[in-house]
């Protein structure tokens, strides 16, 4: 019994104190049809779900941001969920100001979208989202909400969150020239199953799931906050040619992780002028870093 208690205590300590800050830096290619040669070989870093608030230490996020900045990324994208509300239901504004001051900047662009938590209680508080956008923009992010922006010939489209009151739906891509090289940011991957894509068949970068945060080895996580349980983590191909990459999140909404480490994704952009297939998960390489 004593050995079982020690083993259980050790596993609990690991899941509570070690793995939530044991960041995996995943390096992989991102092949975009028609990507301008000017951007070929450039780096694009995806950060997601930092959840500034009671469950993620400021010091951990700041150290992680400094490590990302040391990579000198060309483009940084953030795919939603800046915060977790405090126990009194208010956004952690002072914490956000401290942490976002260190948010890594891309040499060409730093772009963000909102997640469901950025809309406050029950994902319905527009005033919270407005505050989050202001703080993010003050920190150097260009926030896109059912809009697109151009980065050296690459069109980056950002959806507002699926669960929030301002989800753009089919109108977003109807107003976009999909013949241009395009990358879509969409916090909740469940949006992939909605009839809103207007023939788009490129890459989507998502977050939201945290990879489930906890799972037994070789098994799926028991709890994932999406309807479509395919959308857990990593690269998922869709039948119509779209591909989504679901980031496992840098933070968490409850401080526990087991066998699902936090993630920062470092993509190297490449052009698909010849229509060659996108690379598979087998081509992914990663570097593990304990931020401590």
Question: Which positions does each model-derived feature cover?
Answer:
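N-terminal membrane-anchoring alpha-helices
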Residues: 1-38
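Acidic, His/Gly-rich catalytic cores of divalent-metal-dependent hydrolytic chemistry
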Residues: 13, 17-26, 238-292
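Beta-strand-turn-beta hairpins that frame and shape the catalytic cleft
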Residues: 32-45, 141, 148-157, 177-179, ...
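Membrane-embedded segments
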Residues: 38-142
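Binuclear metal-dependent hydrolase catalytic cores centered on His/Asp/Glu-rich metal-binding motifs
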Residues: 122-141, 147-148, 152-196, 257
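Conserved beta-sheet core of the metallophosphoesterase superfamily
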Residues: 189-265, 273-274
